[in-house]
């Protein structure tokens, strides 16, 4: 039998089980209101769908450069400048296929095996799973309603942390930093 890595011993991501149960119920004709995941509530804009269709039709599909298409990274940089008045160099932007891939890249770049990383509680369950799979120690930081469920300096003074994950907006609370 193949040996199983200790890093793979993560808690199940229960929301996936909930989604599967909902899918089965929908197949049986049940009307389900999905509140289990942060799926977009609207379709992709027509201009985006048209652009993607055009690109697929005119170009061969294949791998992009590893950090993401330079034109897309430049547009993301411009968006940050327009929206937040932030001068962000496109070379500092990495485009991923989803947040989990971005978490893995970020945590791998920032922490070494065995480092202690604080996460606010409640928090997105995947943070804990990803940190554990990277052999990082997760330290729960109990957050409070009066702080909008965000960690504050007083919450982290005695935890001997190598880093802290601050999410804004936070999942599952939806709270945001000012």
Regions found by a protein language model. Give the residues of each.
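N-terminal small-domain helix-loop-helix segment of the aminotransferase-like
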Residues: 4, 8-98, 105
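Glycine/Thr-rich phosphate-binding loops of Rossmann-like dinucleotide-binding domains
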Residues: 43-45, 103, 127-128, 173-174
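Conserved PLP-anchoring active-site segment centered on the Schiff-base-forming lysine
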Residues: 109-131
